[in-house]
UniProtKB/Swiss-Prot annotation:
Binding site for ATP: G10, P11, M12, Y13, S14, G15, K16, T17, H53, D83, E84, V85, Q86
Keyword Disulfide bond included in the entry's annotation: no
UniProt-listed GO biological process terms: DNA biosynthetic process; thymidine metabolic process
Name of the protein: Thymidine kinase
Residue positions of the active site: E84 (proton acceptor)
Length: 184
């Protein structure tokens, strides 16, 4: 039986990692073997753990290239969990397809859009393959409504790949994005 791909996406501060961690917990409670991964580039909260903004976390294999996952996935692995997929190169798509064909469920969390509203290529590829998409929203940093679907960069230059937290990025709704973008 083929595995299923679930992609959790949305802006920063929308609870993507928290949702991913809840699926890890469900698999562990079900006594299913899991493998958890994060990109080496993301060491904001911890170097070897996936940690949510709320502080919850789980140990993870830290890798640079998606192909490195294969050495950590054992014959009896039932679930693979990957955080911050936007930071991986597009070869993650082929690795995930292989895992699904092997009957392993895969859960991915990551940003869908850059702060310039351009799609992250790796996330877009995974969304095209997904059996289930969970599109998260956040509370808009400016108006306070629970309608934020975009991430706005407020400090640190224009680079689209620039790891950071609240010191660089805020979640905003489209109206507030357009208003604030004129000022930034």
């Amino acid at each position: 039986m083929s595995g299923k791909l679930t992609v959790i996406t949305g802006p920063m501060y929308s609870g993507k990692t928290t949702e991913l961690l809840s699926f890890v917990e469900i698999y562990k409670l079900g006594k299913k073997k899991v493998a958890v991964f994060k990109p080496k580039i993301d060491s904001r909260y911890h170097s070897t753990m996936i940690v949510s903004h709320s502080g919850n976390g789980v140990e993870a294999h830290v890798i640079e290239r998606p192909e490195e996952m294969r050495k950590y996935i054992e014959e009896d692995t039932r679930g693979v969990f990957i955080d911050e997929v936007q930071f991986f190169n597009p070869s993650l798509f082929e690795v995930v397809k292989d895992l699904l064909d092997r009957g392993i469920d895969v859960f991915c969390a990551g940003l869908d859009l850059t702060h310039k509203q351009n799609p992250f290529e790796t996330t877009a590829l995974l969304l095209s393959l997904a059996d289930t998409v969970i599109k998260k929203k956040a509370v808009c940093h400016r108006c306070g409504e629970y309608n934020a679907t975009l991430t706005l960069k407020v400090a640190g230059g224009e680079e689209e790949i620039d790891v950071g937290g609240q010191e660089k990025y805020i979640a905003v709704c489209r109206d507030c994005y357009n208003t604030l973008k004129k000022r930034v």
